[in-house]
């Protein structure tokens, strides 16, 4: 990687998240905005990335070709769609570039492709880059070990009307954290929908409920419900900047790492708590 500042490239630079990633990259010491990418045919091509994000002129123009920017970045930050991210992953693997992946909605084959690429490049792959969410995941592990065998566990998540995958990647990560703490496989105990005459709740399952409405940035609650009491652990995001700041912080953390797959718990050193 580059010897001075870590140079980052931002995918989907013209989107809501892309613009905030640009702002975060310009604000964090030790990080330099090296490149910004948009899809072929976008009206934003040729724009100054900083001006696009409302952060002033940077001299970095929005481009559509990975080949054109391959010498301008060390770490590629991607919060786009699975198919696009996997194309970017193949390019980064070929050229020895690190990646921060915040894209959600991968199928198992896509997740395996990311794990395979981590043999050659360093990747931070997380469902959510918020510091608060990742602290919540740690708390869920602790709560599940104490209460999980005796309570009904439900995960409720809410996002804006434009989100295309459900449950959210964060909700699934919550379920996985709880299931792992209980020595279970989430695939075996998750319940993703209830409709009609469902019968009584099956003990030991983890239920999911999804809301899509308005401009909700992201709200997640895990409920451990018993007779007479329930514990709820909730995280609410009011700005995408919390995700952008965490992603850029992750890119800086990748400095000096040649290969491997990591998540935000590694970046925040939560695994040692």
UniProtKB/Swiss-Prot annotation:
It catalyses: (S)-2,3,4,5-tetrahydrodipicolinate + NAD(+) + H2O = (2S,4S)-4-hydroxy-2,3,4,5-tetrahydrodipicolinate + NADH + H(+); (S)-2,3,4,5-tetrahydrodipicolinate + NADP(+) + H2O = (2S,4S)-4-hydroxy-2,3,4,5-tetrahydrodipicolinate + NADPH + H(+). NADP(+) binds at residue 39. Disulfide bonds: none annotated. Gene3D superfamilies: Dihydrodipicolinate Reductase, domain 2, NAD(P)-binding Rossmann-like Domain. One of its GO terms (biological process) is lysine biosynthetic process via diaminopimelate. NAD(+) binds at residues 12-17, 38, 102-104, 126-129. Pathway: Amino-acid biosynthesis; L-lysine biosynthesis via DAP pathway; (S)-tetrahydrodipicolinate from L-aspartate: step 4/4. Its EC number is 1.17.1.8. Keywords: Amino-acid biosynthesis, Cytoplasm, Diaminopimelate biosynthesis, Lysine biosynthesis, NAD, NADP, Oxidoreductase. GO terms for molecular function: 4-hydroxy-tetrahydrodipicolinate reductase; NAD binding; NADP binding; oxidoreductase activity, acting on CH or CH2 groups, NAD or NADP as acceptor. Its main location: cytoplasm. GO terms for cellular component: cytosol. The active site is at 159 (proton donor/acceptor), 163 (proton donor). (S)-2,3,4,5-tetrahydrodipicolinate binds at residues 160, 169-170. It is found in: Cytoplasm. HAMAP family: DapB. Catalyzes the conversion of 4-hydroxy-tetrahydrodipicolinate (HTPA) to tetrahydrodipicolinate. Belongs to the DapB family. Homotetramer. This is 4-hydroxy-tetrahydrodipicolinate reductase.
């Amino acid at each position: 990687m580059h010897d001075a500042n870590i140079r980052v490239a931002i995918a989907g630079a013209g989107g809501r998240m892309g613009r905030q990633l640009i702002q975060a990259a310009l604000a964090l010491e030790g990080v330099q905005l090296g490149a910004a990418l948009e899809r072929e045919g976008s009206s934003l091509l040729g724009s100054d990335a900083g001006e696009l994000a409302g952060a002033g002129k940077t001299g970095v123009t929005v481009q559509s070709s990975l080949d054109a920017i391959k010498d301008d970045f060390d770490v590629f930050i991607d919060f786009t769609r699975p198919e696009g991210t996997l194309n970017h992953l193949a390019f980064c693997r070929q050229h020895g570039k690190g990646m921060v992946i915040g894209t959600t909605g991968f199928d198992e084959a896509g997740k395996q492709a990311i794990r395979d690429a981590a043999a050659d490049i360093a990747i931070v792959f997380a469902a959510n880059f918020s510091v608060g969410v990742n602290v919540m995941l740690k708390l869920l592990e602790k709560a599940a070990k104490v209460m999980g065998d005796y309570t009904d566990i439900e995960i409720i998540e809410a996002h804006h009307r434009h989100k295309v995958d459900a449950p959210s990647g964060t909700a699934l990560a919550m379920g996985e954290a709880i299931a792992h703490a209980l020595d279970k496989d989430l695939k075996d105990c998750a319940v993703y929908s209830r409709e009609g005459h469902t019968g009584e709740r099956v003990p030991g399952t983890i239920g999911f409920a999804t809301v899509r409405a308005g401009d909700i940035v992201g709200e997640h609650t895990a409920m451990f419900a018993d007779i007479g009491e329930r514990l709820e652990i909730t995280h609410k995001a009011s700005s995408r900047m919390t995700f952008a700041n965490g992603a850029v912080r992750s890119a800086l953390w990748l400095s000096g790492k040649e290969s491997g797959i990591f998540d935000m718990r590694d970046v925040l050193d939560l695994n040692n708590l």
